[in-house]
Amino acid sequence: MGTLFGTDGIRGVANRYPMDAPMAFAVGQAVTYVLKKEKHRTRIIIGKDTRISGYMLESALLAGITSMGGNPYLVGVLPTPGIAFITESMRADAGIVISASHNPYQDNGIKIFGGNGFKLSDEQEEVIENLVLDGKLADKVPPVDRMGQAHRIDDVLGRYIVFLKNTFPRELSMEGMKIVMDTANGATYRVAPESFTELGADLDVIHNAPNGININAACGSQHTEDLRKRVVEKGAAIGLAFDGDGDRLIAVDEQGREITGDQILIICGKMLKGKGRLKNDLLVSTVMSNLGLTVACKKYGFRQHAAKVGDRYVLEDMQRLGSVLGGEESGHVIFLDHHTTGDGILTAIQLIAAMLESGKPLSELARLMDVFPQKLINIDVKSKPDISTLPQVVQAVKDVESALGDQGRVLVRYSGTQNMCRVMVEGPSDEITLKYCRQIADVVKAAIG
C-alpha cells in the first residue's frame, strides 16, 4: 500500500488531510487524467453514503473531474455495491464511492471502481497516487472548451433494486416472512427496505433515519444488540444488519444469536454445492476466518483457500483460482456469479434463499459450522515494522502456538487502514483464548506501542 491508498481506498478524518476538499479535488483530476482516451470524454459515477461530509467531498470530486475534462454523473446516496453495479451497467469509465464503511461519521473515504465494476488494482491506485502527490496536475488541465459537465442520474435506485431482486430464485417466495432490518442509518436506508418489501417480506426496519452524524452509531453490523432484541420481540425469522456503505451483512437468527460472515459462507456454499454451482468446490476466505470454517469445509467436501485480509484480495484470489464464492468473517461476501464486489443486500437475499430451500430455520443452518472461541485485541502503534523483525513478538507467537497445538491458532497483522496491530487468537475455550491473546498483545505493545 502507498501513502494515500490503504486496503480499501483512502481513509481519514473528514475535513482534515488527506480527507479534505483539496485532496478530493486532486483525486478527481488524477482519475480523470489516467482514464482519458482519444475522442472520448471520461465518464465517472460518483456516489456516497449518508455522512455529512459527503457533500463537501462530492463537490470537490466533481470540480476535479470537470476541470480535467471529465463528465461526472452524480447518483447521490447509494450502497457501495450499487455504485459498482451502476458503473458497469452504464459502461462508465470509473465509479467513485465516498464512504468510510463501518467507521464513525467523523471519518470518510474515497474508493474507486474501474469501468468493469471491480475495484482498481494496487498498481492502478499507485499511478493515481503518484499523480496526486507530485503536485503537477495543474499543468495537465485542458483548455476551457474541453472542460466537463456534471450530470445527475435520478433512476439508479430502481435499476439497482431490479438487479437485486433478479438474484432471488423465482420459485421461492418471501411472502409474509417476518424480517427485522438495521440499515445503520447508512447507504442502504432506502434501497434495502424497498427491495425486501417488493419481494413480499413482512418488514420491520430500525436505525433507518440518517441525519449525517448517526451512521453506524450503536447500530448496524458492528452493533447488533438492538437488532437481536427486536428479532426475538417480533418473532422474526431473521435479522439483517448492514454497515454504513452496505457492502457487508451480519445476520441474526430467530433466537437472537449473531451469525458471522464465515457461517454465511458455509450455509450459502452448501446451497450452491447442492445445485452444482459451487465452481471447483472452492470457498475463498481470509487468514482471519474462524478455524471452525476450515473444519466445516473439510466436513462438507469444500476446498478452502485463505487470502490476505481485505475483500479486494479475496476477490483477486477468487478470480485467480476459479471460485464463485468468497468472503470475510466481518460479513463481506462475494457471489461472483452475481456481482463484482461484496454486497450486503445481495448476501441477505442469498442467505434467505438458502433458508427457504432447506426448509430449516437459520439457527439450525448456523450449526453447520462450530465457531471456535476467538479473541481479537487491537493495539495502537507508532510504526509498522515487519513483524518478523521483532524477535520478542515472534517468540511470543511461537510459545502460544506450541501451547495450543492443533486446538487453535494465532495471527498477528497490521491494519490496512489504521495505525494499529491486530492480535487474534483462537482456542478451545474463551478463558484460554483471552489469556493467550493478552499475553501476545502485551509483548506487541511493549515492542511498538
UniProtKB/Swiss-Prot annotation:
Q: Which organism is it from?
A: Syntrophobacter fumaroxidans (strain DSM 10017 / MPOB)
- State the function annotated in the UniProt record: Catalyzes the conversion of glucosamine-6-phosphate to glucosamine-1-phosphate.
Protein name per its UniProtKB record = Phosphoglucosamine mutase
The entry marks the following residues as binding Mg(2+), namely S101, D243, D245, D247
Record GO terms (molecular function): magnesium ion binding; phosphoglucosamine mutase activity; phosphomannomutase activity
Any idea which residues are catalytic in this one? S101 (phosphoserine intermediate)
Q: How is it modified after translation?
A: Activated by phosphorylation.
Where are the Phosphoserine modifications? S101
What reaction(s) does this enzyme catalyze?
Answer: alpha-D-glucosamine 1-phosphate = D-glucosamine 6-phosphate
Co-factor binding comment: Binds 1 Mg(2+) ion per subunit.
Please state which protein family the record places this protein in. Belongs to the phosphohexose mutase family.
Q: Does the keyword Transport apply?
A: no
Enumerate the Pfam families for this protein.
PGM_PMM_I (PF02878), PGM_PMM_II (PF02879), PGM_PMM_III (PF02880), PGM_PMM_IV (PF00408)
Whichever gene encodes this chain, its name is: glmM
| Cofactor(s) it depends on | Mg(2+)
**Classification of source organism:** Bacteria, Pseudomonadati, Thermodesulfobacteriota, Syntrophobacteria, Syntrophobacterales
Q: Which NCBIfam families match?
A: glmM, PRK10887.1
For this record, the Gene Ontology CC terms, alphabetical, are:
cytosol
Q: Which Gene3D superfamilies match?
A: Alpha-D-Glucose-1,6-Bisphosphate, subunit A, domain 3, Alpha-D-phosphohexomutase, C-terminal domain
Q: Which UniProt keywords apply?
A: Isomerase, Magnesium, Metal-binding, Phosphoprotein
What GO terms in the biological process aspect are recorded for it?
carbohydrate metabolic process; peptidoglycan biosynthetic process; UDP-N-acetylglucosamine biosynthetic process
Q: List the EC numbers from the record.
A: 5.4.2.10
If you read the UniProt record, what top EC class would you report for this enzyme, in one word?
isomerase
Q: Which InterPro entries match?
A: A-D-PHexomutase_a/b/a-I, A-D-PHexomutase_a/b/a-I/II/III, A-D-PHexomutase_a/b/a-II, A-D-PHexomutase_a/b/a-III, A-D-PHexomutase_C, A-D-PHexomutase_C_sf, A-D-PHexomutase_CS, Alpha-D-phosphohexomutase_SF
